[in-house]
């Protein structure tokens, strides 16, 4: 049974492509006709491609891996954020950080900085700083959160990218291609589908079009997550789950309170120095 259908896609306006003069010839296999100078996408092919992508996404979710959703265009940002959150997946809806994938360790370092700042807030270190210093660090935290907050739980490279408008997000696509990360993409008639592993031919400018496609794909991912959870419960019931190993004792001696306060103060000073140099 299909994840979506012709009528649903038609009602959402998924069939509207771009002006003929803006088309990319590589999208010819997915174009049904031209009407009033505008290309019309073959929605029968869109249905098939949505099903293909949804099944692959389901298997990724079932395996416990992450899919990174990318959409920085205004029409898609909010809906992508909502759908990604519904399946507990990371997403980028602000500016794509250059090197997000190809220089992932640096991005992780910035994410960890947010966690460190949060710790300074909770452990009382802030009380030893001036209002100006607290404001500087808080601004750093807000700036980091805006661009990286939605990927805070991404501890390793994603197993796939789901991109809205592959032409606008060309840097993200290139980074994924370079690392061999599969790319799922909603591809309009003005875009090049060549480097997209799972092409979903559809209108990528209308919010409703993006929403109905994400609905189908995320529903499949939810199924995958539920199947993973059910299999885990069955394994535990059958006694096949690996025994919980005791936590390894840390080789480092525990820091006493004064040492920890000194380290946190040093971290706060480092953040302030970075802010002044920026």
Locate the predicted segments by residue.
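Ribosome large-subunit tunnel/peptidyl-transferase-proximal elements
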Residues: 1-233
